[in-house]
A protein has these predicted regions:
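C-terminal single-pass membrane-anchor helix
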Residues: 282-319
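Terminal targeting segments of Actinobacterial cell-envelope proteins
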Residues: 1-40, 278-283, 313-319
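Solvent-exposed, non-transmembrane regions of membrane-associated and secreted proteins
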Residues: 32-290
Length: 319
């Protein structure tokens, strides 16, 4: 059948038999937009979860170190409160007892704190005597270690067990207690490279001339770095006491993650901090500084940036 002009203009065509049929324009199903929107929402949720996991993995070391700093601050505050509750005469007695201990520390007990070799066994009485020194709160906290230029502020504990080295600074048994005095050499150590805390990671940036302190009871003992060296684990020759000298050596493993050698930071006692030294203001304060949790800002900011980028991409895609 021949199609008329009117039929052509109206969009109809003749059927095989009978009257012409009119074309119908197909319209999207009513729920198709909702389906596409639901798919976009699920895609956004999935991508946000992936982004959160990725940011979490990247920022985990910073977050873990911040929470560790809170724990360190709590331990230091508890130690300070215990010391303040002691009478001045009692504090003096504790320090005098520690200095008397230093005058008779057992010889031959120095060992690399990270070596798999078992340490030389101490007599039970000697070990009990050691652990009772400076232990005013019965929690094995000996004092406080601060290295301002490296942002290290940690409690000092008895011994160098794995538990101790993972939570703060350990005092090496067989070395002098960190209470100063001629003919003393204290060895302090902590881990580097563990994922949940910085601890002695920054020690690899130590420089000669840096000033750090130990705080025991109500006394602050100042030390200035005079020598830095890297030695093999079994080389303990520079950890021995030198007559008339008041020294501290800081020890950690190096290189980080390899741990084949030991980084030794040697320092000698000084009477006071030079007025122009950057440590002057920091060491004058007592409050532990845990720092601002920038990792939260980075995490939230990263998720927000990803969310906005996804919305912009999805909008262009729909168009």
């Amino acid at each position: 059948m021949t199609q008329t002009l009117k039929e052509f203009m109206e969009g109809s065509e003749p059927g095989p038999e009978g009257p012409p049929r009119r074309h119908r324009t197909r319209r999207p199903a009513a729920g198709s937009k909702r389906i596409r929107s639901g798919l976009a929402d699920r895609r956004l949720f999935t991508m946000m979860v992936i982004a959160a996991i990725g940011l979490g993995l990247v920022l985990y070391p910073q977050a873990a170190d911040w929470f560790s700093s809170i724990s360190h601050s709590s331990q230091l505050s508890g130690y300070a409160q215990e010391v303040e509750q002691l009478e001045p005469s009692a504090r003096t007695k504790v320090l005098d007892r520690a200095r008397e201990y230093n005058s008779r520390i057992p010889g031959g007990q120095l060992r690399d704190p990270y070596s798999a070799q078992a340490p030389m066994p101490a007599l039970e009485g000697q070990l009990r005597d050691y652990q009772s020194q400076l232990n005013v709160a019965n929690d094995d906290v000996v004092g406080r270690f601060r290295y301002p230029s490296l942002n290290i502020d940690l409690p000092i504990f008895h011994g160098t067990s794995d538990d101790v080295l993972a939570k703060g600074v350990g005092h090496l048994y067989g070395s002098s207690l960190p209470v100063g005095g001629p003919g003393t050499h204290s060895v302090l150590t902590s881990h580097s490279g563990i994922p949940n805390a910085e601890l002695f990671n920054p020690l690899h940036s130590a420089k000669t001339g840096d000033i750090f302190s130990t705080e025991v009871m109500d006394h602050t003992f100042l030390y200035k770095v005079n020598r830095i060296e890297v030695v093999k684990p079994d080389d303990i020759s520079s950890l021995k006491i030198t007559a008339g000298e008041d020294s501290i050596t800081l020890v950690t493993c190096t290189p980080i993650g390899v741990n084949s050698h030991r980084l030794l930071v040697h320092a000698s006692r000084i009477a006071d901090i030079p007025k122009d030294a950057p440590e002057q203001k920091t060491l004058a304060g007592r409050q532990a500084n845990i720092g601002f949790p920038y990792w939260i800002v980075y995490f939230v900011g990263g998720l927000l940036a990803f969310y906005l980028a996804f919305l912009a991409w999805n909008r262009r895609r729909v168009r």
